UniProtKB/Swiss-Prot annotation:
GO molecular function annotation: iron ion binding
HAMAP family: Fe_traffic_YggX
Protein name as annotated: Probable Fe(2+)-trafficking protein
A single BP term in Gene Ontology: cellular response to oxidative stress
Organism expressing this protein natively: Acinetobacter baumannii (strain SDF)
Keyword Isomerase: no
4Fe-4S as UniProt keyword: no
InterPro entries xref list: Fe_traffick_prot_YggX, Fe_traffick_prot_YggX_sf
Classification via SUPFAM superfamilies: YggX-like
Record key words, sorted: Iron
Task performed by this protein: Could be a mediator in iron transactions between iron acquisition and iron-requiring processes, such as synthesis and/or repair of Fe-S clusters in biosynthetic enzymes.
Amino acid sequence: MSRQVFCRKYQMEMEGLDFAPFPGAKGQEFFENVSKQAWQEWLQHQTTLINEKRLNVFEPEAKKFLEEQREKFFNNDESVEKAEGWKPE
């Protein structure tokens, strides 16, 4: 049986991640409070942001921007960035 978590994005019990997505306290927080589905959706959204905004993920400004967007995404904040011209299917 898969591990269940109360997903902070969807506000319901869902299948959890298999492991923390990155080391440290923040990674553990996502492991405990984000569903596998929500994490996959974030990875897709992050990839879109990186490509459309031509971010260099090695630059501190880009890392900070993505961290801020990740928090907004999982908190269902309306101000999360969308790629220009992007329309959800």
